[in-house]
Amino acid sequence: MLSMFMCNNIVDYVDDIDNGIVQDIEDEASNNVDHDYVYPLPENMVYRFDKSTNILDYLSTERDHVMMAVRYYMSKQRLDDLYRQLPTKTRSYIDIINIYCDKVSNDYNRDMNIMYDMASTKSFTVYDINNEVNTILMDNKGLGVRLATISFITELGRRCMNPVETIKMFTLLSHTICDDYFVDYITDISPPDNTIPNTSTREYLKLIGITAIMFATYKTLKYMIG
């Protein structure tokens, strides 16, 4: 009985010590710590969440981004391997094509910005647009500006909710854009077709260009009608 009593006292004593230590720690913390203080996050922390974040959706999106990055990397590795296996002459032509495509892309982006600035500051009729585009094409012989013009009038067609005016605009501009310079670019990048007489090749290619722009008209009208 005595030993049991002593054991119980020892246990109670140890519990009292533990409780006292915990209370001392809490008192010390309450005296020295500002409870409103927000600890700074590490500068290199990438992921920061709030209570509204759906972690599962976030991780799913991250997985998609990672997979796309992996696919891009693998494709690039295969292309790099193929490029290294090509003859020197072939690689030199690829370099020339890259330079040309970069120039077309830069011209396209620059001319698109010019056209959007023009459209945002002025109000045009169909004939005004045709005259403006014709002036731009006369001052610039590049392919980039012609591609930019096609994109521009397609965007304008979507903003104009009058189908009749849209058709009129595309009809006028299809002939304006498909000029001799446009046909020359198509001729340079198209394989020769021996079934077409040389005398009618240019007319044929011009017709192809007009048809392509009219197809853009159809897609625009379909977008407008819904």
From Swiss-Prot:
GO BP terms, alphabetized: negative regulation of interleukin-1 production; regulation of apoptotic process; symbiont-mediated suppression of host apoptosis
Induction summary: Expressed in the early phase of the viral replicative cycle.
Entry's localization field: Host mitochondrion outer membrane; Host cytoplasm
Keywords of this entry: Early protein, Host cytoplasm, Host membrane, Host mitochondrion, Host mitochondrion outer membrane, Host-virus interaction, Inhibition of host apoptosis by viral BCL2-like protein, Membrane, Modulation of host cell apoptosis by virus
Region (Essential and sufficient to inhibit host NLRP1): 32-37
The keyword Membrane is assigned to this record: yes
Primary location group: host cell
One GO molecular-function entry: protein sequestering activity
GO-annotated cellular components: host cell mitochondrial outer membrane; host cell mitochondrion; membrane; mitochondrion
Matches recorded under Gene3D superfamilies: Blc2-like
Superkingdom of source: Viruses
Assembly information from the UniProt record: Homodimer. Interacts with host pro-apoptotic protein BCL2L11 (via BH3 domain). Interacts with host NLRP1. Interacts with host BAK.
Family: Belongs to the orthopoxvirus OPG045 family.
Chain's role: Plays a role in evading host innate immune response by inhibiting host inflammasome activation. Interacts with and inhibits NLR-mediated interleukin-1 beta/IL1B production in infected cells. At the host mitochondria outer membrane, interacts with the BH3 domain of host BAK and prevents BAK from binding active BAX. In turn, host apoptosis is inhibited.
Protein's UniProt name: Apoptosis regulator OPG045
Lineage: Viruses, Varidnaviria, Bamfordvirae, Nucleocytoviricota, Pokkesviricetes
